């Protein structure tokens, strides 16, 4: 292999998933810039690299240096020092401040920061606070760089090196060498495969018990990401064996040890991760106890009279027989489910239930899984609705403030968008519901199930353990909406009306070519809808069936940002640039910041000096450091899965055969029902027909239904 020393001038391409990059560099002895390609996680312009590899000639792109391994050095010239300091690696120094510091100290800049940081006070604009921040950051970077050199050859980016340092401190290298699989357990974003790559290079055997244990946990974790609460023992061993390429005996030995130590829970032949097992057991036990607890006799006896009184007072609201039955059933039940599609009167029925319980002097709590769903519930009822996390008074230090020891205070809890609630969240919610309280779960059972593990609402309905009211009639005011009528047609397996009338709220634009479809979507969002309907682009949401492909959410986000918000100071991470005015989404729960997976906000400030980003989530400003930007993604486009519980004035949805692996009836139904005023599909009738007739929905491995239907009346443990 040949060794070169180069300075990065431009990064012309970088794959955020695997780190493959194309760098334009200057190399001593070459007049023109040279192309260097390889795996370069999180390198910055101005960095000086020593790279080992080989020159070759690419048929399309010409002469390139293909990197096998590399290390980063501190630059030795003025321009390089300035670029390095301004890259964001050193907290407290951005591009402008870097110019001032280097102008003052020249080639001595690094020596000053290293040995006499107080001299930075000589630079105009630098105070004692910033000096302290720079000194601490510089020391941290030295430690992180040692870790980075160690991890670099194992496919771990500098971002994750910083997270590893934050988790383990100066013991990071020792910790990773001792058991690299701890990374998969402790560091968000580092999975089993990265940890396994490190372990292999450290000489771990394929049958090592630590490797088998981590592989089993990874397999169960991946299943939970697909919605499963457990795996059958035989299938788990088979899947782990395929993943690990190890012998079966050490895998079964590791599995038996984990069951014996209660690191995994065995229920017949079903193997659970403990949180999912205890959540299922907790939900089943609490629901059964609620159902078995008697209702106050006076309330039950007055149900019919109260319903009649409420309907007379709400004369402007038309209730049909099923809705009246739902109101009476709510008064006479401890637990009830109210389900129905768009336009069937779930909100009207909920209003009737609220009015009836208020007439009875009952205290009512309203909640929903997400901030947007809670806001919609508040607007529809005129009463305060909270997210489940806020209802339960969650704080990151102590967990849920409301629980079985400190239950909720009220008589009735109504939870909207219940199909979104996974088994873990439902267990936390039910712990806080006292036996004296009534519970009504409202939702559309035909939408996508929860993103998290479980199929809670479906299991409760199918168990027959609680009364279920199904609203099916589309009310007169909703019949004029083709969003509503087409959603119901799709849900019934019928092809929708796609004739594009001028007064319609549902349009289908035919386009077979994915690239032209993407261009058309950008044109629709930027030009056609704002001009025709006088709607801001902020009220338009693009919903894609998947992330990947030309018409996937990732590519559409880049194209839409370029069209809507192309210029301004920015911070970059994961292939995206974030600017003031960008719509962004939180993609993991961050309890410290009180923002949750799926929350959408707007970037209100970008500080390129401090390398921070401020995002407004419903009026709450949250600051992100550069290393935290992987918690965000652009949200001009998002997946239909991520849109659950939200409504948007306008929805634009690509639907082409390039999405075929995701084309299912409930996916398209969920996407269409997110639109309040206008829905536009861009794609092919073939893809739409394929989705409508594809009812093959993956069955989720859960045992909640069986626990609820168990006639033995035993309490699960």
PLM region descriptions:
Residues 445-593, 604:
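Conserved helicase motor core of P-loop NTPases
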Residues 397-411, 422, 430-437, 537, ...:
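Short basic/glycine-enriched coil/helix segment immediately N-terminal to the Walker B
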Residues 599-717:
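C-terminal accessory regions
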Residues 1-299:
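Accessory, non-ATPase domains that flank or precede helicase/AAA+ motor cores in DNA-metabolism machines
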Residues 363, 409-413, 436-440, 678-679:
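Loop/turn-to-beta-strand initiation segments
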Residues 417, 443:
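Walker B catalytic acidic pair
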Residues 230, 242, 265-413, 461, ...:
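ASCE P-loop NTPase motor cores of helicases and related translocases
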Residues 46-48, 581, 598:
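Loop/turn positions that initiate beta-strands
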């Amino acid at each position: 292999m040949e060794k070169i020393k180069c300075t990065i001038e431009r990064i012309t391409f970088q794959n955020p998933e695997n780190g493959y990059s194309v760098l334009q560099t200057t190399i001593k002895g070459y007049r023109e810039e040279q192309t260097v390609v390889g795996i370069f996680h999180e390198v910055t312009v101005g960095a000086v690299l020593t790279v080992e590899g080989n020159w070759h000639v690419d048929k399309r792109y010409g002469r390139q240096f293909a990197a096998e391994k590399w290390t980063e050095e501190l630059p030795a010239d003025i321009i390089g020092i300035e670029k390095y300091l301004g890259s964001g690696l050193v907290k407290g120094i951005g591009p402008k401040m870097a110019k001032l510091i280097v102008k003052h100290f020249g080639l001595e800049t690094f020596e000053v920061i290293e040995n006499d940081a107080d001299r930075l006070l000589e630079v105009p604009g630098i105070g004692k606070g910033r000096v302290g921040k720079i000194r601490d950051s510089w020391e941290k970077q030295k430690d992180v760089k040692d870790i980075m050199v160690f991890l670099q050859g194992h496919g771990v980016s500098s971002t994750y090196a910083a997270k590893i340092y934050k988790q383990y401190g100066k013991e990071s290298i020792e910790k990773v060498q001792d058991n690299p699989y701890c990374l998969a357990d402790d560091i968000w974003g580092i999975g089993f495969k990265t940890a396994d790559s490190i372990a292999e290079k450290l000489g771990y055997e394929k049958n090592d018990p630590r490797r088998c244990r981590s592989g089993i946990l990874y397999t169960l974790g991946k299943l939970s990401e697909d919605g499963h609460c457990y795996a059958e023992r035989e299938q788990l061993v088979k899947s782990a064996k395929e993943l690990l390429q190890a012998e079966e005996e050490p895998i079964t030995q590791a599995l038996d040890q984990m069951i014996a130590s209660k690191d995994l829970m065995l229920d017949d032949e079903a193997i659970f991760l403990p949180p999912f097992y205890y959540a299922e057991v907790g939900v089943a036990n609490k629901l059964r106890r609620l159902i078995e607890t008697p209702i106050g006799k006076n309330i039950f006896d007055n149900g019919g009279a109260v319903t009649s009184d409420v309907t007379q007072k709400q004369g402007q609201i038309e209730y049909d027989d099923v809705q009246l039955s739902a109101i009476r059933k709510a008064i006479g039940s401890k637990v009830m489910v109210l389900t129905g599609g768009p336009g069937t009167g779930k909100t009207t029925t909920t209003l009737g239930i609220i009015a009836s319980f208020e007439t009875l002097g009952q205290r009512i709590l309203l909640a929903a899984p997400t901030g947007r769903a809670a806001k919609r519930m508040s607007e529809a009822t005129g009463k305060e609705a909270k997210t489940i996390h806020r209802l339960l008074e969650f704080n990151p230090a102590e967990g849920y403030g409301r629980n079985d020891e400190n239950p909720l205070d009220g008589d009735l809890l109504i939870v909207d968008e219940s199909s979104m609630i996974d088994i873990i969240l439902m267990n936390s919610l039910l712990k806080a519901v006292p036996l004296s309280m009534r519970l009504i779960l409202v939702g559309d059972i035909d939408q996508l199930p929860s993103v998290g593990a479980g199929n809670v609402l479906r299991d409760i309905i199918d168990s027959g353990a609680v009364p279920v009211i199904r609203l099916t009639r589309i009310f007169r005011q909703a019949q004029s909406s083709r969003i509503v009528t087409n959603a119901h047609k799709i849900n019934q397996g019928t092809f929708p009306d796609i004739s594009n009338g001028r007064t319609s709220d549902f349009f289908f634009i035919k386009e077979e070519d994915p690239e032209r479809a993407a261009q058309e979507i950008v044109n629709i969002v930027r030009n056609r809808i704002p001009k025709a309907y006088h709607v801001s682009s902020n009220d338009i949401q693009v919903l894609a069936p998947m992330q990947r492909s030309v018409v996937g959410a990732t590519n559409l986000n880049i194209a839409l940002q370029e069209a809507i918000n192309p210029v301004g100071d920015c911070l970059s991470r994961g292939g995206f640039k974030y600017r003031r005015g960008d719509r962004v989404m939180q993609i993991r729960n961050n309890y410290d910041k009180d923002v949750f997976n799926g929350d959408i906000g707007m970037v209100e400030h970008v500080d390129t000096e401090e390398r921070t980003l401020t995002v407004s989530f419903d009026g709450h400003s949250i600051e992100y450091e550069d290393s935290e930007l992987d918690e965000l993604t652009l949200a001009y486009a998002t997946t239909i899965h991520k849109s659950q519980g939200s409504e948007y004035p306008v929805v634009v949805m690509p639907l082409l055969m390039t999405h075929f692996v995701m084309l299912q009836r409930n996916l398209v139904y969920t996407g269409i029902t997110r639109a309040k005023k206008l829905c536009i599909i861009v794609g092919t009738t073939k893809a739409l027909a394929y989705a409508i007739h594809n009812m093959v929905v993956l069955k989720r491995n859960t045992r909640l239904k069986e626990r609820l239907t168990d006639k033995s009346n035993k309490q699960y443990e």
